[in-house]
Amino acid sequence: MIFVDACLKKPTPYTPVWMMRQAGRYLPEYMAVRERAGDFLSLCKDYKKASAVTIQPVEILGVDAAILFSDILVVPLEMGMGLRFEKGEGPVFDRPVKTAGDLAVLDVDRAVKNLSYVYDTIALTRENLARDKALIGFCGAPWTIATYMIEGGGTKTYAVCKKLLYTNPEFLHQILAKVTAALTDYVKAQIRAGVDAVQIFDSWAGALEESAYFEFGWRYILQIVDSVKTEFPDIPLIVFPKGVSGFLDKISGNFEVFGVDWSTPIGLAKEKLSPKFVLQGNMEPTRLYSKKAIDAGVDKILNTMKGAPHIFNLGHGILPDIPVENAKYFIKQVQEKSHNHK
């Protein structure tokens, strides 16, 4: 698998490429399956349909890896928090974590057991996915998951979570510890089900100042990494903390790949983190609106990363209104142009 080889810094004929949110609304084939499923969560829980949309981008676009179709919030959902997705509002938890009592009723073991539909999706996908294509599992990072659990949904200010951080840090650590335990077991279960690599998404890493991030964010990611590596030392792990370009000097850990978001100059990430880590990223997603912009973006990143271990990706998820033709063009350009760079 070219993707796994790249994660492990083995020689590859070209730079492997995939896209975050590649199984998504820009694909008519995805929308057809989602319509049959009824709603987003129902699609996540129907392992046959979830597997089908996981594989779609590989077959339609020719990406080098599939990423499991699911959502980072299925873990707190199955811990016992009522979750729904409101149109125009995003995810909403019926019972946010406000007190020690709220936290106490959340069940780690129940969550890992109840997520069997995810493991079934993985097993079916690995069975039907081409042998040379990697299957990437994923989870949210503890800090990002905790923000949703405490705020009760998405937030622009993180005010409730940050108030807790500065007024009752011990309780926030308790929440993070429980979430970390659930995520660690969940990642291990995904690996047992058949994923070839795992990505940890810390979407809200950039909401914290440096000292707070390394106390309440990064340390818990490393707990997951270290525990998983103890049991599965050969499975590549990818960490994607969005918005931490100012903290790159402090990044270390027992993982293989560091995901670079589009706001971080990849040359800076290369200077700070390569070749210790394989870098993944980081084209600005809106470049996909224009083939000319795609060409320029691909050339710039390939030239910057020439000679360094690299996996090509966007610097965030693909947007719902990107033309499929442009997405195909992007994948083809990366594969063809990087072949000439090797």
UniProtKB/Swiss-Prot annotation:
InterPro entries: UROD/MetE-like_sf, Uroporphyrinogen_deCO2ase_HemE, Uroporphyrinogen_deCOase. It is found in: Cytoplasm. GO terms for molecular function: uroporphyrinogen decarboxylase activity. One of its GO terms (cellular component) is cytosol. It catalyses: uroporphyrinogen III + 4 H(+) = coproporphyrinogen III + 4 CO2. Keywords: Cytoplasm, Decarboxylase, Lyase, Porphyrin biosynthesis. Its EC number is 4.1.1.37. It is an enzyme of class 4 (lyase). The record marks D71 as: Transition state stabilizer. PANTHER family: METHYLTETRAHYDROFOLATE:HOMOCYSTEINE METHYLTRANSFERASE RELATED, UROPORPHYRINOGEN DECARBOXYLASE. Belongs to the uroporphyrinogen decarboxylase family. This is Uroporphyrinogen decarboxylase. The gene is hemE.
